[in-house]
Amino acid sequence: MKKTSDYAVAVIGLGSMGFGAAASCINAGLTTYGVDINPQALEKLRQAGAAQADTRIDAFADKLDAVVLLVVNATQVNGILFGEPQVAAKLKPGTVVMVSSTISAQDAKNIEQRLAEHQLVMLDAPVSGGAAKAAAGDMTVMASGSDLAFEKLKPVLDAVAGKVYRIGEEIGLGATVKIIHQLLAGVHIAAGAEAMALAARADIPLDIMYDVVTNAAGNSWMFENRMRHVVDGDYTPKSAVDIFVKDLGLVTDTAKSLHFPLPLASTAFNMFTAASNAGFGKEDDSAVIKIFNGITLPEKKEAP
């Protein structure tokens, strides 16, 4: 195994999770590169100590031991690897590609097959934990792939993860575990929004309702994290409504392929879809509460 400073990794996709993962790689002493179309994110990563940050991987592709993809969906993963940027064709044979986007199991398998044509190794490795845990190097990784892929990515996994779950060798297992996790995450947000909407309708102050739930048995991590945004009237997106339209769509597609009923997930999917259709798709996912009529929600307090 190389010394950490000799190990080079590029993180593609410097959103809240990707930026945190890249910063954690820098903090762990890895030679870290960043790729994104956002110039502010690139400059911020340079300031954090990246070896280089650019809109394309061309200048440093041949230096890399690993690539981490933290983009929105399978379309973006395929476009980056095999589309116009042709990232896969520019990497050295044997480079390991960690695909951490939330995608279907079939998409993961298809991507792995195409990477193998370029003699590249894939780890199917979705992540969870949010921006704060990404920045702290404490994400949860649910991964499947070969022993070789895990071995090649050990410096990266050590840098970005608090927990790494090895689901098995078959590509697609990691993707499926993440999809099932997203079922719970989406249902928790939708249920939390419904409860807070009922409280608003009943003229219960939402800050009091929030305080009661977060100190009682009905609490969940998603309620505590997302319903705080409702109380604050701040729908600046940490994760957008449209992300859960996508993720719960993957949940329902997975269930359909298995002929398996998901009544709660289907309802949550419809709630997020309604919120997106009403114009809230780019807002924080807690904005799903805005589908309820006849209630008054807190407004964001402007800083003095």
UniProtKB/Swiss-Prot annotation:
Entry-linked PROSITE patterns: 3_HYDROXYISOBUT_DH
Record-given protein name: L-threonate dehydrogenase
The keyword Lipid metabolism is assigned to this record: no
One GO process term, biological-process aspect: organic acid catabolic process
Top EC class, one word: oxidoreductase
EC numbers: 1.1.1.411
Active site residues according to the UniProt entry: K178
PANTHER family assigned to the protein according to its UniProt record, in alphabetical order: 3-HYDROXYISOBUTYRATE DEHYDROGENASE-LIKE 1, MITOCHONDRIAL-RELATED, L-THREONATE DEHYDROGENASE
Function: Catalyzes oxidation of L-threonate to 2-oxo-tetronate. Can use either NAD(+) or NADP(+) as cosubstrate, with a preference for NAD(+).
Entry similarity comment: Belongs to the HIBADH-related family. L-threonate dehydrogenase subfamily.
Organism the protein comes from: Pectobacterium atrosepticum (strain SCRI 1043 / ATCC BAA-672)
Binding site for NAD(+): 7-35, 102, 246
One MF annotation (Gene Ontology) recorded for this entry: NAD binding
NCBIfam families, A to Z: ThreonDh
Cited InterPro entries: 3-OH-isobutyrate_DH-rel_CS, 6-PGluconate_DH-like_C_sf, 6PGD_dom2, 6PGDH_NADP-bd, HIBADH-like_NADP-bd, HIBADH-related, LtnD, NAD(P)-bd_dom_sf
Pfam families in the cross-refs: NAD_binding_11, NAD_binding_2
Recorded catalytic activity of this chain's protein: L-threonate + NAD(+) = 2-dehydro-L-erythronate + NADH + H(+)
